[in-house]
A protein has these predicted regions:
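Extended alpha-helical scaffolding segments
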Residues: 74, 80-81, 89-106
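Surface-exposed loop/turn elements that mediate protein-protein interactions on large endomembrane-trafficking
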Residues: 1-10, 41-66, 95-120, 130-139
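Non-catalytic amphipathic alpha-helical adaptor/oligomerization segments
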Residues: 66-74
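Beta-strand C-termini and the immediately following turn/loop, strongest in propeller blades
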Residues: 31-35, 43-46, 88-91
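Structural signature of eukaryotic scaffold interfaces centered on beta-propeller domains
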Residues: 2-26, 31-34, 73-80, 122-139
């Protein structure tokens, strides 16, 4: 079961920063950022005072999207264990962090995790999206 922790409207290319903490673990958080050119999803561990960002995932380049002037629905959900955070845009998982297994999922595995981190990146597949959401979401 997923818990919706944030729901907002998104216009690609309009700067935005939003985030939420895990529903179970106060030290875990995620943040979405559109800097006007690109969208990124960040994993944060608030116990790491010097640098709480432990991983990031590319979500989109504004120039490579169609109809970026149209409003989109932005949602962040956490699983019931508080270790899996999903970034949904119009109901589709565009980026996911699995804090329990230190895996970031997106469509292009970009950018590569820092060599000193324990994180890895994998591609979002229809099977994974179905397992996370319980429905077939990626076409």
């Amino acid at each position: 079961m997923l818990h919706l922790t944030l729901e907002d409207q998104l216009f690609l290319g309009q700067p935005k920063q939003v985030g939420t903490h895990s529903t179970v673990h106060d030290h875990l958080a995620v943040m979405f950022e559109d800097d006007g050119e690109t969208g990124y999803f960040y994993a944060l561990d608030m116990r790491q005072n010097a640098q709480p960002i432990v991983d990031c995932l590319h979500v989109y380049n504004v120039d490579n999207t169609r109809n970026h002037h149209e409003a989109r629905k932005l949602e962040i959900c956490w699983d019931e264990n508080g270790y899996l955070a999903l970034l949904l845009i119009n109901g589709y998982p565009h980026a996911v962090f699995d804090f329990a297994h230190l895996i970031g999922y997106n469509t292009n595995k970009h950018p590569q995790p820092d060599l000193m981190s324990m994180w890895t990146h994998e591609e979002i597949t229809n099977e994974r999206a179905t397992a996370w959401l319980g429905v077939n979401t990626i076409k």
